[in-house]
Design a protein with these regions (language model features):
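The feature marks helicase ATPase cores and/or their adjacent C-terminal helical subdomains
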Residues: 1-502
């Protein structure tokens, strides 16, 4: 894929750089191109760290890179600070009692209220946990303290890394932001930041989009804006651009407005009305806020003649220990026909306890897991054997969730959503996906706060050629309409200038 002029500018800009990348602008392609170029041009012993929010995103970066990344760190935010700061240097700050094996457990049962309780949990149980208050971040608070107090830690990071790349920065919380800026401003490690405050859908769990905005004005950063949406048609671009001050200037009227339909309808008629404007031969998605509304919506659309597949959240999606990736990989191995032992091996995190295991042994153990799916106890034993071999610990409640995921076929669709022409999913699960046609409900977005506005922006920018907004007569839906009119009015635009009301 060729680079656009602004993408080339970003790839060729040296030093600290922040990129504001609107939806559909080719952010990942640009970042991967930049990482590859700067690794190839590096003439020192130093390496890079590419830091993401999910193992899936890290794997996508690894898969796309055409250069050897064996020595480089490509992984999640938490794994970076745990493996590079906490595990090797905690003993420098807290003493030899903390020179021990550590594992993570962010489950509800392991949560604590205070920093001192979390420190004690490491000492007594070897567990890195999280706070009861999900807007506070113990892991990054601890890493920050260690980094500030351990000279060896600071020297190690400075000697090892020549650049750090941070993806989806709008989802960073305040503790993450403080640590990353310490790496940049104090340790002088060059930093590349990419994000978009318009897509911050995790404010409820502590995401702090203002942190991203604050870097935009820093004198030691060059800033670039990617606004060309290669996914959505011009009319949908207009609609999404009018939602935010910084993109309103990108609005330009279009002669045809049929790509966005506003349906004023009822709870009994919405499905049949919406399907009048859906092409059954093109992929589409119903995006709702709650799982219940998503499931019910799929049923109503299906009852009206177009089969919509509800994509549920799987039981294993709730698991937050370091073994979570393995449960997911085992499920994919058992559910997806073309997913092999080699695919599982490729997913072993770079920060894992051991990545150089014998392929034949892993294949044999996976076969044992597969052959035990009809016996829950044997399934637990076979899965635990594989986890132990790879250096990971299991919990019975998590093994139960995995067994439920692989034996209850209603969850299988969640592992191969691309197989289905028409799907119904929550918009939180739709981040990073795209569909020709999208149906959203006005009542899911009051547009009265930052979180609601971000959620709506993410949902509508999943659509490529058709957006259907279902407006029923409810308080939330009426708030949506009033607030949308106010947002559009800032550009002197009315709703009817942007879409067709039915």
């Amino acid at each position: 894929m060729n680079l656009s002029p602004i993408q080339e500018e970003i790839v060729n800009t040296s030093g600290n750089l922040i990129v504001r990348a609107s939806a559909g602008t080719g952010k990942t392609h640009t970042m991967v191109s930049k990482i590859a170029k700067e690794i190839n041009e590096n003439r020192t012993h130093k390496v890079v760290a590419a830091i993401t929010f999910t193992i899936k995103a890290a794997q996508e970066i690894k898969d796309r890179l055409s250069v050897d990344v064996t020595r480089h760190f490509i992984g999640t935010n938490n794994s970076f600070v745990i493996e590079e700061i906490i595990k090797p240097f905690m003993k420098d700050v807290y003493g030899s009692d903390y020179d021990l094996d550590m594992s993570t457990d962010y489950s509800k049962e392991a949560k604590v209220d205070t920093f001192s309780e979390a420190i004690e949990k490491i000492k007594t149980e070897g567990i890195l946990c999280s706070y009861t208050d999900n807007k506070k971040n113990f892991i990054f608070e601890l890493a920050q303290e260690i980094m500030e107090k351990s000279t060896a830690c600071r020297l190690y990071l400075q000697a090892k890394y020549f650049k750090i790349y941070i993806d989806e920065y709008q989802d960073c919380d305040e503790s993450m932001h403080k640590l990353f800026m310490y790496l940049c401003d104090t340790l002088k490690i060059k930093t590349f930041v990419v994000g978009d405050e318009k897509q911050s859908i995790y404010i409820w769990r502590g995401a702090h989009p203002d942190a991203f905005v604050s870097i935009w004005g820093k004198s030691n950063f060059t800033s670039k804006f990617m606004g060309d949406n290669f996914r959505s048609c011009k009319q949908i671009q207009n609609y999404s651009n009018l939602l935010y001050d910084e993109t309103r200037n990108l609005y330009s009227p279009t002669p045809e407005l049929n790509n966005i339909m506003w349906l004023s309808t009822t709870s009994t008629a919405w499905a049949s009305e919406a399907l009048k404007y859906i092409d059954p031969n093109k992929k589409s998605a119903l995006l709702r806020f709650s799982n219940d509304n998503t499931r019910l919506g799929a049923g109503e659309l299906s009852a009206n003649g177009v089969d919509y597949t509800y994509i549920p959240q799987t039981p294993i999606a709730e698991i937050t220990t370091d073994t979570a990736w393995l449960y997911s990989a085992i499920a994919k191995y058992l559910i997806i026909e073309k997913y092999s032992a080699y695919d599982l091996i490729s997913e072993i995190p770079v920060e894992g306890n051991e990545t150089h295991k014998i392929v034949s042994t892993i294949k044999k153990m996976l076969k044992n897991v597969e052959q035990s799916v009809n016996d829950e106890n044997n399934f637990y034993l076979a899965t635990n054997d594989l986890a132990t071999y790879l250096g990971y610990a299991t919990k019975n409640e998590h093994l139960k969730k995995l067994f439920e995921t692989v034996t209850d076929k209603k969850y299988h669709v969640a592992f191969e959503p691309d197989k289905y022409q028409h799907v119904a999913i929550t918009f939180h699960s739709s981040k990073g996906l795209e569909f020709e046609q999208v149906i959203v409900f006005a009542e899911d977005y009051r547009l009265s706060d930052v979180s609601s506005l971000c959620n709506h922006y993410v949902a509508v920018t999943r659509a490529k050629s058709k957006l259907i907004i279902v407006k029923q007569n409810s308080y939330n839906a009426n708030c949506f309409q009033v607030n949308l009119e106010k947002l559009f009015a800032k550009s002197g635009v009315k709703i009817n200038d942007v879409l067709v009301q039915i």
